[in-house]
């Protein structure tokens, strides 16, 4: 009789454990289905997107996007892309959106935007011993930019009267190369986001001089395809505004840059 009772108890316990295990698996499957993945296209652009010592994508844009999409019920995947093909990739659906210190200025009608969530200065940097001190001193000089970026357009189009005619505008595929060209003396100056230049100097223990006169102050946003009507862009915009108000954005930016408050002065950009 005792053996039968023991057997019955063991059997009930086994059934209970199997049931709980099944529920746990079901919960995990359910949790996965609740977390669709958003693919974010970016190139290497410290401090916005770069690989840490463990080879994991990190940076301002990575953290902001991860938190915004977490609040929306999504997981994020950072996809390293050829920056020159970003528009083609987002329009084809191979990525869901473009981030990576992406300027909204002059591109408002090209994409569906979430942002601006950061205000950034486009600036010119030179070697410390350079005789270039203001934008007009760039006349006849050689300047390097990353291809398809806002500085490239500024110097190609020269719609701003302050921008002189260069000797040569050299467009390079990767951001790191423009700093190498400047350090080696292949060019007289480079133009990029101020944060990128400052980060490069920290990472490589080098020193450039940034001109006080900026090329432009621009808003940084996340770009979706123009015909993307899923509503994800609009939801992300709401979450980014929420993060701005509750201090989350400030906390993230503070990890990477000094004087983080100035980068959140987006209300006067007019977008």
Give the residues covered by each predicted segment.
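Periplasmic-binding protein-like
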Residues: 42-44, 119-126, 202-238, 259-271
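Acidic, polar ligand-binding/catalytic clefts
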Residues: 66, 75-137, 209, 214
């Amino acid at each position: 009789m005792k053996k039968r009772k023991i057997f019955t108890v063991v059997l009930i316990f086994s059934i209970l454990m199997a049931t709980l295990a099944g529920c746990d698996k079901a919960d995990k499957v359910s949790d996965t289905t609740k977390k669709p993945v958003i693919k974010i296209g970016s190139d290497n652009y410290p401090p916005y997107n770069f690989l840490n010592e463990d080879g994991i994508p990190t940076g301002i844009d990575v953290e902001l996007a991860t938190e915004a999409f977490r609040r929306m019920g999504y997981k994020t995947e950072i996809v390293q892309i050829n920056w020159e093909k970003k528009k083609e990739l987002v329009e084809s659906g191979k990525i869901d959106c473009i981030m990576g210190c992406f300027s909204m200025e002059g591109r408002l009608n090209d994409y569906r935007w979430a942002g601006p969530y950061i205000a950034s200065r486009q600036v010119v940097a030179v070697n410390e011993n350079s005789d270039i001190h203001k934008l007009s001193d760039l006349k006849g000089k050689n300047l390097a930019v990353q291809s398809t970026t806002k500085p490239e357009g500024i110097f190609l189009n020269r719609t701003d009267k302050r921008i002189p005619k260069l000797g040569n505008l050299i467009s390079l595929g990767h951001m790191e190369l423009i700093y190498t060209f400047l350090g080696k003396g292949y060019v007289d100056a480079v133009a990029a986001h101020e944060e990128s230049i400052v980060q490069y100097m920290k990472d490589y223990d080098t020193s450039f001089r940034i001109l006080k006169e900026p090329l432009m102050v621009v808003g940084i946003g996340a770009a979706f395809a123009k015909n993307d009507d899923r509503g994800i862009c609009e939801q992300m915009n709401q979450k980014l505004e929420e993060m701005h108000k509750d201090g989350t954005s400030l906390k993230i930016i503070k990890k990477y840059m000094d004087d983080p408050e100035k980068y959140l002065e987006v209300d006067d950009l007019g977008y």
